[in-house]
Protein backbone atom coordinates (compact mmCIF):
# COMPACT_ATOMS: atom_id res chain seq x y z
CA UNK A 1 0.00 0.00 0.00
CA UNK A 2 1.42 3.38 -0.95
CA UNK A 3 1.14 6.08 1.70
CA UNK A 4 2.32 8.80 -0.67
CA UNK A 5 5.95 8.46 0.35
CA UNK A 6 8.50 9.87 -2.02
CA UNK A 7 10.77 7.44 -3.85
CA UNK A 8 13.85 8.63 -1.96
CA UNK A 9 12.39 7.60 1.41
CA UNK A 10 13.51 4.09 2.24
CA UNK A 11 10.60 2.78 4.25
CA UNK A 12 9.20 -0.69 4.33
CA UNK A 13 5.51 -0.30 5.08
CA UNK A 14 3.27 -3.32 5.13
CA UNK A 15 -0.42 -3.54 5.98
CA UNK A 16 -1.60 -7.06 6.04
CA UNK A 17 -3.77 -9.63 7.62
CA UNK A 18 -0.90 -11.78 8.76
CA UNK A 19 -0.87 -15.43 7.80
CA UNK A 20 -0.08 -17.49 10.87
CA UNK A 21 3.72 -17.55 11.14
CA UNK A 22 5.54 -20.17 13.13
CA UNK A 23 6.56 -18.93 16.55
CA UNK A 24 7.90 -21.10 19.37
CA UNK A 25 6.58 -19.83 22.71
CA UNK A 26 9.35 -19.89 25.30
CA UNK A 27 7.76 -18.25 28.33
CA UNK A 28 4.82 -16.06 29.23
CA UNK A 29 5.26 -13.60 26.35
CA UNK A 30 1.89 -14.52 24.78
CA UNK A 31 0.02 -13.93 28.04
CA UNK A 32 1.87 -10.66 28.67
CA UNK A 33 1.09 -9.38 25.15
CA UNK A 34 -2.59 -10.33 25.47
CA UNK A 35 -2.87 -8.53 28.83
CA UNK A 36 -1.12 -5.46 27.45
CA UNK A 37 -3.48 -5.46 24.44
CA UNK A 38 -6.59 -5.86 26.62
CA UNK A 39 -5.45 -2.97 28.83
CA UNK A 40 -4.74 -0.72 25.81
CA UNK A 41 -1.08 -0.21 26.71
CA UNK A 42 1.95 0.10 24.42
CA UNK A 43 4.60 -2.62 24.48
CA UNK A 44 8.34 -2.43 23.88
CA UNK A 45 10.18 -5.54 22.73
CA UNK A 46 13.87 -5.48 23.62
CA UNK A 47 16.54 -7.86 22.43
CA UNK A 48 19.30 -8.57 19.94
CA UNK A 49 18.71 -9.15 16.24
CA UNK A 50 17.45 -12.63 15.45
CA UNK A 51 15.64 -13.31 18.72
CA UNK A 52 12.17 -13.41 17.14
CA UNK A 53 10.73 -10.00 18.01
CA UNK A 54 9.21 -9.34 14.57
CA UNK A 55 8.01 -12.92 14.20
CA UNK A 56 6.37 -12.68 17.61
CA UNK A 57 4.47 -9.51 16.63
CA UNK A 58 3.23 -11.20 13.43
CA UNK A 59 2.21 -14.26 15.46
CA UNK A 60 0.30 -12.16 17.99
CA UNK A 61 -1.48 -10.08 15.32
CA UNK A 62 -2.64 -13.33 13.76
CA UNK A 63 -3.66 -14.81 17.13
CA UNK A 64 -5.68 -11.67 17.95
CA UNK A 65 -7.15 -11.49 14.42
CA UNK A 66 -5.83 -7.94 13.91
CA UNK A 67 -4.32 -6.19 10.92
CA UNK A 68 -0.68 -5.28 11.33
CA UNK A 69 1.28 -2.34 9.96
CA UNK A 70 5.04 -2.79 10.19
CA UNK A 71 7.44 0.13 9.84
CA UNK A 72 11.15 -0.67 9.59
CA UNK A 73 12.60 2.48 11.12
CA UNK A 74 15.92 3.96 10.02
CA UNK A 75 17.78 7.23 10.49
CA UNK A 76 15.60 9.04 7.92
CA UNK A 77 12.21 7.88 9.25
CA UNK A 78 10.33 11.02 10.26
CA UNK A 79 7.03 11.81 11.91
CA UNK A 80 5.72 13.03 8.54
CA UNK A 81 6.42 9.57 7.09
CA UNK A 82 4.28 8.05 9.84
CA UNK A 83 1.53 10.64 10.30
CA UNK A 84 0.91 11.72 6.71
CA UNK A 85 1.31 14.65 4.38
CA UNK A 86 -0.38 16.91 1.92
CA UNK A 87 -0.03 15.87 -1.71
CA UNK A 88 -0.98 17.46 -5.01
CA UNK A 89 -3.70 15.56 -6.84
CA UNK A 90 -4.78 17.18 -10.06
CA UNK A 91 -5.55 20.80 -9.30
CA UNK A 92 -6.00 20.35 -5.56
CA UNK A 93 -4.00 19.65 -2.45
CA UNK A 94 -5.26 16.73 -0.37
CA UNK A 95 -4.21 15.14 2.89
CA UNK A 96 -2.93 11.56 2.74
CA UNK A 97 -2.87 9.64 6.03
CA UNK A 98 0.37 7.89 6.88
CA UNK A 99 0.60 4.41 8.41
CA UNK A 100 0.43 5.66 12.02
CA UNK A 101 -2.73 7.67 11.37
CA UNK A 102 -4.25 4.73 9.48
CA UNK A 103 -3.56 2.38 12.40
CA UNK A 104 -4.90 4.84 14.99
CA UNK A 105 -8.14 5.44 13.07
CA UNK A 106 -8.81 1.81 12.11
CA UNK A 107 -7.68 -0.11 15.19
CA UNK A 108 -4.67 -1.87 13.68
CA UNK A 109 -1.53 -2.97 15.46
CA UNK A 110 1.34 -0.63 14.54
CA UNK A 111 4.82 -2.14 14.87
CA UNK A 112 7.75 0.28 14.87
CA UNK A 113 10.73 -2.02 14.32
CA UNK A 114 14.01 -0.49 15.53
CA UNK A 115 12.24 2.65 16.77
CA UNK A 116 15.45 4.04 18.30
CA UNK A 117 16.89 4.38 14.78
CA UNK A 118 14.16 6.84 13.72
CA UNK A 119 14.49 10.60 13.94
CA UNK A 120 13.65 12.14 17.35
CA UNK A 121 10.41 13.66 16.01
CA UNK A 122 8.98 10.12 15.71
CA UNK A 123 9.19 9.69 19.49
CA UNK A 124 7.52 13.08 19.96
CA UNK A 125 4.73 12.07 17.53
CA UNK A 126 3.88 8.86 19.42
CA UNK A 127 4.24 10.40 22.88
CA UNK A 128 0.52 10.99 23.57
CA UNK A 129 -0.32 7.52 22.21
CA UNK A 130 1.77 5.94 24.97
CA UNK A 131 -0.15 7.32 27.92
CA UNK A 132 -3.74 7.46 29.16
CA UNK A 133 -4.73 9.92 26.42
CA UNK A 134 -4.13 7.49 23.51
CA UNK A 135 -4.35 10.44 21.12
CA UNK A 136 -2.59 11.45 17.94
CA UNK A 137 -2.22 15.16 17.29
CA UNK A 138 -1.72 16.10 13.65
CA UNK A 139 -0.18 19.54 13.71
CA UNK A 140 -0.53 20.08 9.94
CA UNK A 141 -4.30 19.60 10.22
CA UNK A 142 -4.77 21.09 13.67
CA UNK A 143 -6.68 17.93 14.63
CA UNK A 144 -6.44 15.35 17.38
CA UNK A 145 -7.58 11.75 16.89
CA UNK A 146 -8.50 9.47 19.76
CA UNK A 147 -7.07 6.01 19.09
CA UNK A 148 -9.56 3.34 18.08
CA UNK A 149 -10.21 0.89 20.94
CA UNK A 150 -8.40 -1.89 19.06
CA UNK A 151 -5.28 0.18 18.26
CA UNK A 152 -2.03 -1.08 19.74
CA UNK A 153 1.45 0.42 19.55
CA UNK A 154 4.33 -2.06 19.52
CA UNK A 155 7.95 -0.93 19.26
CA UNK A 156 11.23 -2.81 19.29
CA UNK A 157 14.86 -1.96 19.76
CA UNK A 158 18.19 -3.63 20.40
CA UNK A 159 19.66 -2.09 23.57
CA UNK A 160 23.45 -1.94 23.45
CA UNK A 161 23.46 -3.81 20.14
CA UNK A 162 26.41 -1.98 18.65
CA UNK A 163 28.77 0.83 19.44
CA UNK A 164 27.20 4.16 18.63
CA UNK A 165 23.71 2.68 18.65
CA UNK A 166 20.95 5.09 19.51
CA UNK A 167 19.34 4.31 22.84
CA UNK A 168 15.81 5.14 23.89
CA UNK A 169 15.65 7.65 26.72
CA UNK A 170 14.46 6.23 30.06
CA UNK A 171 11.55 8.70 29.96
CA UNK A 172 10.42 7.07 26.70
CA UNK A 173 11.04 3.47 27.81
CA UNK A 174 8.99 3.93 31.00
CA UNK A 175 5.88 4.66 28.91
CA UNK A 176 5.88 1.08 27.58
CA UNK A 177 5.42 -2.34 29.10
CA UNK A 178 8.77 -3.97 28.33
CA UNK A 179 9.25 -7.54 27.18
CA UNK A 180 12.80 -8.89 26.76
CA UNK A 181 13.86 -11.37 24.10
CA UNK A 182 17.18 -13.20 24.43
Spans of features found by a protein language model:
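AAA+ P-loop NTPase catalytic core and its hallmark functional loops
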Residues: 1-182
Amino acid sequence: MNFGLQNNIKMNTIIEEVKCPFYHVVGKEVEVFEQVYQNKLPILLKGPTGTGKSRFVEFMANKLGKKLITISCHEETSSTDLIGRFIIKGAETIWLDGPLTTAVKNGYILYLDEVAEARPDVIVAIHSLTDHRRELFIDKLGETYKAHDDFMLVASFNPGYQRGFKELKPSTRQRFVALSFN
